[in-house]
């Protein structure tokens, strides 16, 4: 399974409807958006997976940005704006 198809299936939970879009941002990035992911009652948040040089961020607008990142930290945050 490719990274793109794995992220697409994660961004489309079975019991919700969603709109998704995929577009390239630059040579080292890809942007995906979906309105179907929620973080508690607020929706949104951020989650980083940079361990292998890859960073995935889910922001409060539920966009997933994938970029090259050499950081070794992993974090998750969720909150209301």
From Swiss-Prot:
Segments for region (Disordered): 1-31
Tree of life domain: Eukaryota
Pfam families, per database record: Coiled
Record field: compositional bias (Low complexity): 9-31
GO biological process: sorocarp development
Family note: Belongs to the hssA/B family.
Protein name (Swiss-Prot/TrEMBL): HssA/B-like protein 1
Organism classification: Eukaryota, Amoebozoa, Evosea, Eumycetozoa, Dictyostelia
